[in-house]
């Protein structure tokens, strides 16, 4: 088929061209060349991170052709590079209004919606893209990721598996499936996909794969296996928060409090005002019977800001030292601020039992049940008291 240009010149030769003349066509050729050069320059400037200069180049094109698809997509890309996603989305939308189905505009617009956490809109756009290219692995994994973000397990998994049918060892699909199953608390399945990722890339493994495998073992309470992967991660980065946290928590789970303290304190060397870690360290010292040091860590956490678990830790120290009335007052206050925490009711009931107030212990446990909540620990304690 002839190009538009040759079709137009044929019309000129037979006198059917209307206002077109050979002269104005000759004038349009340099203009087209100028637009092409400006477009090429704009994209090169984006690659060099000279965003403002790139925008100027694309805007010059729009002065000549307000609907030029290269310029509109280029401006969208430039705005997106500066994290101005609303402005970028406007340019991509303008392009699509004049050039429906432009793949670059579709991809850019979907990426903007994803960045703005508007996952449903991103999915709609990507599915339009897939009409034109339903085997694009990058887009398929993006759509699967978006479905995962809106917690549509079935559609997300279907798309990840579709990618694996096309490319059995695709890293994005394997990692995505790992995250998907982990998010839905299916830790064994998550472990399978992350282990597969490790197997595929053993020589150059990403540290996040190691910590993810370790986290699955933490959740499955196979703490000794988790230790191995967190230690491997630390060999890659001795300051990695997730590896240090994972090791501390695994040793806590194995009841090796002295080892967990070692890693909690390593985190505190890097982040001394982390109140969650201060409280965890306090818990470890308390479980070892070192109430003085434990209280110091809890108070350090509370000096940063209020923390329920630090207050609970101090209440449990009072209980551990036989100061039951103090513990009862603290635990009763905590229940007022966190009525659904079954642990508070159990500790308070235990204080009542220790002070020979069995009826009050039963009452407080029944108060929890009246909330319509279920806890096997509360039920078992109530049955034991009532027996």
Residue ranges and their predicted role:
Residues 35, 69-70, 103-104, 137-138, ...:
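Helix-start (N-cap) detector for alpha-helical repeat units in TPR-like alpha-solenoids
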Residues 47, 81, 115-116, 149, ...:
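Register position in tetratricopeptide repeats
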Residues 40, 74, 108, 142, ...:
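Canonical tetratricopeptide repeat
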Residues 64, 98, 132-133, 166, ...:
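Structural marker of alpha-solenoid helical repeat scaffolds
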Residues 18-37, 60-63, 201-205:
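TPR-adjacent "capping" and linker segments in tetratricopeptide-repeat scaffold/adaptor proteins
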